[in-house]
């Protein structure tokens, strides 16, 4: 198992009764997590002094309850900066557990010692996009949500990557890939959430399966 243990601005403080107590930078959030099936005493003071609490509804979905939390704030991971804001389905705009993948991608790209072209599909707010761009890759970032692509651009700007070779595409990922195939465009690596696929079997030096 890979563990994302290089965070300084994120940590799981405690978890009990189907919920996680998390620190995101200077703020503490409580969010539901179905994998937390144990019932242990909630001794951490953050359980009583959180900045926001997402309450799951028995009918599906849920809603946030806020206690002194700004509309938006930022956290850092290495040289990267991410803008966070709570929205639907308990999300904050970042999956911190993916950092272990960002590090792996970055190491592979740097060790290639040549130009690397990456396609990031379902790219969300750009965590993987920024990581591989910072490592020196040229990136095509594709997501069907215009709002998410705009958010990813904001993260790029916050990370000092506004001028990095990133193509921002708002499109259906499957349709975009179909058009890229017809155009004859090739990539050294394709990222889909936490999955990695090799587009060129003759280039195992760039990224291979872990």
For each predicted feature, which ranges?
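S-adenosyl-L-methionine
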Residues: 150-188
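Conserved SAM-binding loop of SAM-dependent methyltransferases across substrates and taxa
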Residues: 125-137
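Single conserved hydrophobic/aromatic residue that forms the stacking wall/gate
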Residues: 196-210
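Non-catalytic substrate-recognition/targeting regions of SAM-dependent transferases
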Residues: 7-22, 29-96, 103
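Conserved SAM-binding motif I beta-strand of class I
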Residues: 138-143
């Amino acid at each position: 198992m890979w563990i994302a243990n290089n965070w300084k601005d994120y940590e799981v403080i405690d978890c009990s009764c189907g919920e996680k107590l998390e620190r995101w930078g200077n703020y503490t959030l409580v969010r539901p997590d179905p994998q937390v099936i144990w019932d242990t005493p909630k001794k951490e003071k953050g359980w009583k002094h959180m900045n926001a609490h997402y309450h799951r509804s028995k009918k599906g979905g849920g809603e946030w309850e806020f206690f002194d939390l700004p509309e938006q704030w930022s956290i850092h991971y290495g040289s990267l900066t991410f803008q966070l804001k709570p929205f639907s389905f308990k999300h904050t705009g970042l999956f911190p557990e993916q950092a272990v993948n960002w590090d792996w991608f970055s190491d592979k790209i740097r060790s290639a010692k040549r130009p690397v072209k990456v396609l990031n599909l379902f790219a969300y707010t750009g965590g993987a996009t920024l990581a591989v761009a910072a490592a020196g890759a040229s990136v095509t970032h594709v997501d069907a949500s215009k709002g998410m692509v705009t958010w990813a651009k904001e993260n790029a700007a916050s990370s000092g990557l506004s001028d990095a070779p990133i193509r921002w595409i708002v499109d259906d990922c499957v349709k975009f890939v179909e058009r890229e195939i017809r155009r004859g465009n090739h990539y050294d690596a394709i990222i889909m959430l936490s999955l990695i696929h090799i587009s060129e079997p003759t280039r195992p030096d760039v990224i291979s399966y872990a």
